[in-house]
Amino acid sequence: ITVPSAKLGTPFNEEVEHLQRLVALAHKEGVQVNIRNQSDCLAADPDTITVLCDNVDNLGLAFDPSVYVCGSEVGKDPEKLIKYIRHLYLRDSSPDNYQVRVGQGTVDYGQLVHTLNKMQYRRAMSVDIVPQEGIEHSAEMRKMRLLLESLL
């Protein structure tokens, strides 16, 4: 399951204790808990995510690369997060827009897939494209599928 992390300003130790309790309960039932990296949350900065995952046994990351293309975390290097990724959200983004048409953004899917392959990533991927007025959603989904198939 994917859970949001606490908002910025939440005491770090409080969030660690909360996640430890949640992960321990889920782990007993065979459920993987992942935090999603999101702007304006503790799980936005790659260094903070690393410390959270290192301090909460069995905690994974539901990774959205768009956070590092558009938003408060632009320019931060998420490479160190690869080993924690248990789920991947995919959409194309630009520095000005969290979601753009597939192929018009700056998410480097080739590099992302290459890095995940090196780490032998064999987990979930979700295409997370929200329908937009004037854009055929099914065409955008097909383009993303074709892009991913060409890279895998």
Residue ranges and their predicted role:
Residues 14-17, 41-44, 107-108:
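Short secondary-structure boundary/capping elements
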